């Protein structure tokens, strides 16, 4: 009798083990997730200067080659023309220290940090208080989403190799979003309706685990079709990176008045930021015109 009981218990244990093995990676064990620790800087493409562009494989400016509609192609051209005169173009909100939001924050003007937990993956922009939450707890989309800069993200980890380890994070981010948004500092525009959808596949490189990919597909009414870019990041070699504070407002010398941006000089005077700029309206300021 005891032998039959022991045999039955062993059979149940074996069946359980086989079930766990066949089910692939188990979400209850962090050891089954990729090691994303460290500071991740944007991948610098040789010959392109390492600028903080959205598509790192294309030249700066119009060379980004986003499939813009004619209306939004003109928005980009007007933005670049304004920047050529010293202005900010569509980048004005970010220049005034508004949060970058999606997808600009993934350009990684400062290194990114990925914090993986069982139910949420956090993406932090180094040196600032700007971050994303990607919920991986199996939730559905809420009926109402509050407007935000980063959007609302739901994802899931996938074991593509069937080896019991998660290796790809798939995520979708929806709005409504806040503010006038751009892909990067060129002013490459997203639609002003703020209803973009971003779909991502985040994974370590198969050959070099110190390279991280983020395939971002953008669905936006400023585009003629969905646009996919494979953004890459390089893990810094420091095993214990220091994360120092670096808030935009502490280093900016720009001041917005109405729809104009001016420089604040060292002696506290408002100075023009581009050619042919009208003087600031100082009726409510104690400053002599200059």
Feature annotation, model-predicted:
Residues 10-21:
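Bacterial N-terminal signal peptides
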Residues 24-290:
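PEST-like low-complexity, intrinsically disordered acidic/proline/serine-rich tracts
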């Amino acid at each position: 009798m005891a032998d039959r009981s022991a045999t039955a218990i062993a059979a149940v244990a074996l069946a359980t083990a086989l079930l766990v093995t066949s089910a692939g990676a188990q979400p209850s064990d962090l050891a089954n997730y990729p090691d994303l620790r460290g500071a991740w800087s944007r991948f610098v493409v040789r010959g392109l200067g390492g600028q903080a562009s959205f598509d790192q494989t294309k030249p700066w400016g119009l060379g980004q080659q986003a499939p813009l509609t004619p209306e939004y192609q003109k928005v980009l051209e007007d933005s670049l023309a304004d920047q050529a005169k010293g202005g900010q173009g569509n980048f004005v909100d970010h220049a005034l220290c508004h949060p970058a939001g999606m997808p600009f924050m993934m350009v990684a003007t400062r290194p990114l940090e990925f914090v993986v937990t069982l139910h949420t993956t956090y993406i932090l922009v180094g040196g600032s208080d700007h971050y994303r939450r990607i919920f991986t707890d199996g939730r559905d989309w809420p009926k109402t989403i509050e407007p935000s800069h980063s959007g609302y993200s739901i994802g899931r980890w996938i074991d593509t190799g069937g080896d019991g380890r998660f290796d790809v994070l798939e995520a979708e981010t929806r709005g409504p979003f806040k503010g006038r948004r751009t892909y990067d500092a060129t002013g490459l525009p997203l639609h002003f309706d703020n209803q973009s959808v971003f779909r991502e596949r985040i994974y370590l490189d198969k050959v070099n685990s110190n390279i991280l990919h983020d395939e971002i597909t953008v669905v936006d009414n400023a585009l003629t079709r969905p646009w996919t870019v494979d953004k890459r990041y390089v893990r810094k070699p420091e095993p214990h990176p220091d994360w120092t504070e670096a808030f935009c407002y502490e280093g900016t010398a720009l001041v917005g008045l109405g729809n104009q941006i001016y420089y604040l000089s060292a002696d506290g005077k408002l100075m023009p930021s581009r050619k042919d700029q009208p003087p600031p309206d100082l009726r409510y300021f104690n400053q002599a015109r200059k």
